[in-house]
Amino acid sequence: MRCMTRSTTGRWSCLVAVCVLTSYGVAQTAPASPTAVHPDPSDQRIRFYQAQLARDPDFWVSYNRLAGAYAQKARETGDITYFELAESALEHSLKLESTHDEAAPAYVQMASVHLAEHRFQEAADDAAKAMSLIPGDLSALPYAGDAQMEMGNYPQSRKFYDLLANAPDDGKPHPAMAFLAASHTAGLDWIEGKTDRAGEGLQNAVKMARTLHLPAENLAWTEFMLGEQYFQLGKLDAAEREEMASLVAYPRYHRALAAMGRIRAAQGRLKESITFYTQAVAIIPLPIYVAALGDVYAASGNPVEAERQYKLVEYIGKLSAINRQVFNRELALFYADHDRKLPEALGLAQKELEVRHDVYSSDALAWALLKNGQTTRAQEAIEAALRMGTVDALLEYHAGMIYQAAGDHARAVAHLERALAINPHFHVLFAPQASKALAALHVAPSVSSASNATASGSLGLGGAASVAPAGGSHAQ
């Protein structure tokens, strides 16, 4: 969730924000910045380390600390220009010191920045350099694991996370490493369908973030991620509790605002959903937020405003024409979801799979293939998406629609029922479509049919039992 975009598009990101907020008239919806009254801690840190470097431009440690302040600002605001600045600061640091163990922290930070920029192989290389400089050091392991997970190398990712979790006890407390182990490992646990374990990891991470007095955004992100897990499992009240806690920790946090928009839509409170999404878009107009806002307008019977938002997503896509590394998957899914620019959707999904062989890239490819009439290939791609046993209603919905198009009604029913069993409100438009598709297959979506699908596993976090989809591969 933390991934942002490539550093080479940092200035483009600011251009998108300015053009979108100005051209589409949403800037006026943004509340006044709290920094006008209270100095922003990240800005203060940036100015402090800039001043230190002005006095001593050859002290490489100050470059590392400045990079950390820039990266934190990027996470807080969604403005990836700060990741570009962080990368530049780290490059200066490594020019001064790159071969001794003192350089390891810079390589660890560079791995984190490259992950945020979706440069996953470079992130893996950075982490490897850090580990080679200080064998046995734990700092690089979370990012080594993250890079492999993003590239779909799940067994290798697990090895790194296990090394982090099972580090030898040296008799000293390492609370920061414990937080990183809990929060990073939870993502892989979720992908592997271990939802109980993923939830426990994030719950522990939230407690540790509070105990460690981490920056407000770090706590807000952890609360947000826990809320995301609850939403995925259809536990709307718990999801709302965590997202509101995220907003208490960091007011105007765009991720939590968008999450609340999705929760309100699932609750049928569409006007409130629109308000939350509009606030998120005003802060940072990410395509996924704008598309979701359009979907809520469509669900509320306002096709004109929905189309306006959809055109805004296309506008963002045009501005990113030079380099679409970050938004490939989001744009591919948007085009496929709304039957727009379908050949382009397929091209974007294929391009994304070149660098990310993870389950979600396979899902995007499967959906784009279906919409382009390539049903056989879509079945192959959706099997790849389901291979880890990930509990995700949208994956199951896509699988159900693909098998319906292929004429395999038994599998279609199994996947559509599973989607609604996981979360009957998983999407403001597609959950109703899943129910209609089941009706067309002469199967009434009901509590009884969902509860009968209880073969293996658990939906976790107190959720209902789950069933492996018919014919689906859950091998790692």
Q: Where does each model-flagged region fall?
A:
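Residue-level recognition of tetratricopeptide repeat
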Residues: 59, 68, 75, 100-103, 112, 137, 146, 171, ...
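TPR alpha-solenoid repeat register
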Residues: 62, 103-106, 140, 174, ...
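Structural motif corresponding to the intra-repeat A-B loop/turn of tetratricopeptide repeats
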Residues: 73, 77-80, 117, 151, ...
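N-terminal leader/linker segments that initiate helical-solenoid repeat arrays
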Residues: 25-105, 424-425, 431-450, 455-461, ...
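Canonical tetratricopeptide repeat
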Residues: 65, 109, 143, 184, ...
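Flexible helix-coil transition and linker loops at the boundaries of alpha-helical arrays
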Residues: 50-58, 92-105, 166-176, 208-219, ...
